[in-house]
Regions:
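N-terminal flexible segment immediately upstream of the FAD-binding catalytic core
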Residues: 1-57, 74-104, 119, 133, ...
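ATP-grasp fold ATP-binding core
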Residues: 66-68, 130
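Conserved strand-loop elements at the edges of beta-sheets that form or border functional pockets
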Residues: 46, 68, 110
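A common structural junction motif
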Residues: 16, 62-64, 125
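Glycine-rich beta-strand-to-loop/alpha-helix junction loops that act as flexible
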Residues: 69-73
């Protein structure tokens, strides 16, 4: 671990709990086919968008490579990088799911497991139609990143067709949001497809 990375971690320790910054041992992230491997000495586990923003803002300033890692079910190696002294940003604690009965909407964080989303919808008498073989371990952030289709794609569309808004943290730490009320969703620009 280089001195810049040590400085990065020391600054983050002021804002995050010890359980959110794991720097003991070596973390390995493999693709499901065991062809690619990503190694890092540090894994950070933010719980909300503001923490992700702080982490990325500081990493951008100090030029620390960040590798976001979700369920690691993707087959194209998106969770693998070639950098040294990279930091893994685990999305596992970004798993909150809320159902809004009045507007008939789900709001989910990027680390939410697809089967958990489907179960919550079912508990409220609704259907979240994305159906994948990996739904017990894949995360919705990865589904959106790859525009997953699944078994019901012909009837309901890809996952981006099911998404009405998006909140994302840019590499410089700025937060982008297209989260609006249902009335404001009529837009000529398909911002989610960009």
């Amino acid at each position: 671990m280089n001195s810049n990375t040590v400085h990065f971690i020391n600054i983050l320790k002021k804002d995050l709990s010890e359980s959110q910054i794991v720097s003991t041992g070596s973390f390995e992230v493999k693709d499901p086919r065991d062809r690619l491997l990503n190694k890092s000495e540090i894994c950070i586990k933010p719980k909300n968008t503001k923490e992700v923003s702080k982490i990325l803002r500081l990493a951008y300033k100090l030029m620390i490579p960040i590798i976001p890692v979700g369920g690691s079910t993707g087959l194209v190696g998106g969770q693998i990088a070639n950098e040294t002294d990279q930091v893994i940003l685990s999305l596992e604690k970004l798993n909150e799911i809320k159902f809004y009965k009045k507007s008939n909407l789900l709001k989910v964080q990027s680390g939410a497991i697809l089967s958990s989303i489907k179960n919550l919808a079912l508990n409220h008498g609704r259907l979240f139609p994305l159906t994948l073989a990996s739904e017990g371990s894949c995360q919705i952030g990865g589904n959106l990143a790859t525009n997953a289709g699944g078994l019901n794609v012909i009837k309901y569309g890809n996952v981006r067709d099911l998404c009405l808004g998006l909140e994302a943290v840019l590499p410089n730490g700025k937060i982008f949001s297209s989260m609006k009320s249902l009335k404001a969703l009529i837009s000529p620009i398909a911002i989610l497809a960009l």
